[in-house]
Structure formats: structure tokens, C-alpha cells
A protein has these predicted regions:
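Divalent metal-dependent catalytic cores for phosphoryl transfer on phosphate-bearing substrates
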Residues: 6-19, 24-169, 173-176, 182-186
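Long, compositionally biased intrinsically disordered regions
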Residues: 1, 9-12, 24-27, 154, ...
């Protein structure tokens, strides 16, 4: 593997680098639980977003001060910038001769999904205009190994968890269930050997790990003065 590439990412896209480490931790834990390869998926997680180094400021984890360069772009231009990190990552994988298993993890971590934020924004603002779906769609393919499905789940959940308004057990559980069930319903896992039971175990791991990361505790109701007096 290429440590210089990771060092460069830590310098030019520090938010992405930290995200990748967290994704690796989550993914490895899921792999241990459902019989995947923890080392492969952890390594793949470290490299899955290397394409973001080409334009790091366009990704929220590398932004600060509330200023976004997307404010100067159209929704289509923004979507193209977002989805391009997969193809840019594959170019770097080829340039640095990364193993094919890592290359495949880069290619599949968004599957054939869409840059949903900008896709929805466009559809809401221009409801009567025809839309070229491909302009908002990642190149794929969808995951075709268990490790690729694990990485997709861990990546999506870790990224979304950073936008939660509050970190309670309920909010974390709702987030994980919504995201993973959505991926399954959209058919992202149809081409890989992962079972319904595997997916439920993955959700449990993600919920428990995120609770630990964000130090959530079950909140107990406070006793009123009358109860305290008894």
C-alpha cells in the first residue's frame, strides 16, 4: 500500500482523512461480526475517498467558516464535482498501483447512487424541466462483495451522523435504520453475497459504535420533588 498517498490526504484533505479512519473502524467491526475480511475493508476505507484530494474544499468535511464553494455553482455542476471523486480516486488507484480489491472498493462505495442533496434541490427548483439523471449519478458499479457492501454502509452512516442535530440513542437508531434500509430498498446489495441477517447485524454494530463515539447515554426521567421526598 502507499503510505505517501495517505500522508498527502491527511495534509490536503484532513477532514476526509479523519472520516476515512472512522469509516475503517466501523467497517472492520461489522466485518468481524458478519464474516467479512476486517483488514481488507479497513484498508479500503482508508483509500476509498482519495479522489477528494483533487478538490477537497468541495466536500463538507474539509470546509470551515460556513463558506461553501458550491454557492457559486449550479446544482448540476455541484453534483458533477461530488460524483467525480470516485473517478478521480480510480485514476489515483491506477497511478499508484493499488491492489484491484482496493480499486473495487473505491469504485463501489457509492454504487449507482445519486448526489442526492443536489439532485433533490434541482428537482424541487425546476419541477417542470426534464432532468438527465446520469449527471447526478455515481459511475458505480453497485457492491458485488460483502466487504464492498460493508464499506458502503459504514461510509454512508458515518458521514450522515456528523449532521445529526443531537446525539441520542433514538436519533442514532433512526438514522442508521433509515440509511441502511434505504440502501437495501434501492437494490444496492442485490449483486453481493450479503444476507438480510447480515444487514441487521451491521445495523446493530453501527448503532452501538456510534453511541460509543458520541458518548450517548440512556436518559432517565428526573424524579419530581414529591417522589424525592418519599
Amino acid at each position: 500500500m502507499n503510505k505517501d498517498l495517505l500522508r498527502r490526504m491527511s495534509e490536503v484533505a484532513p477532514g476526509t482523512f479523519q472520516h476515512s479512519i472512522q469509516v475503517g473502524n466501523l467497517a472492520a467491526e461489522i466485518a468481524r461480526k458478519i464474516g467479512g475480511n476486517p483488514q481488507l475493508v479497513r484498508t479500503g476505507a482508508l483509500y476509498h475517498d482519495i479522489g477528494k484530494m483533487q478538490n477537497p474544499i468541495y466536500f463538507t468535511e474539509n470546509q470551515s467558516g460556513g463558506i461553501s464553494p458550491h454557492d457559486t455553482l449550479t446544482y448540476i455542476e455541484s453534483a458533477q464535482m461530488i460524483v467525480s471523486h470516485v473517478t478521480e480516486g480510480l485514476k489515483l488507484a491506477d497511478k499508484y498501483n493499488l491492489p484491484v480489491q482496493i480499486r473495487d472498493l473505491i469504485a463501489t462505495h457509492h454504487g449507482l447512487g445519486k448526489a442526492k442533496y443536489f439532485y433533490i434541490k434541482y428537482k424541487n427548483e425546476y419541477p417542470d424541466q426534464p432532468i438527465d439523471e446520469l449527471l447526478f449519478t455515481y459511475p458505480g458499479p453497485n457492491p458485488f462483495t460483502k466487504e464492498q457492501a460493508i464499506l458502503m454502509m459504514a461510509d454512508g452512516v458515518e458521514a450522515a451522523s456528523r449532521s445529526l442535530p443531537d446525539y441520542t440513542e433514538q436519533s442514532i437508531r433512526q438514522l442508521v435504520n433509515k440509511l441502511i434500509d434505504g440502501m437495501n430498498d434501492d437494490g444496492y446489495f442485490r449483486d453481493c453475497p450479503i444476507t438480510y441477517r447480515d444487514i441487521q447485524y451491521a445495523k446493530t454494530v453501527l448503532i452501538e459504535k456510534l453511541k460509543t463515539i458520541y458518548h450517548t447515554r440512556i436518559s432517565y426521567p428526573e424524579m419530581n420533588e414529591t417522589s424525592n421526598a418519599k
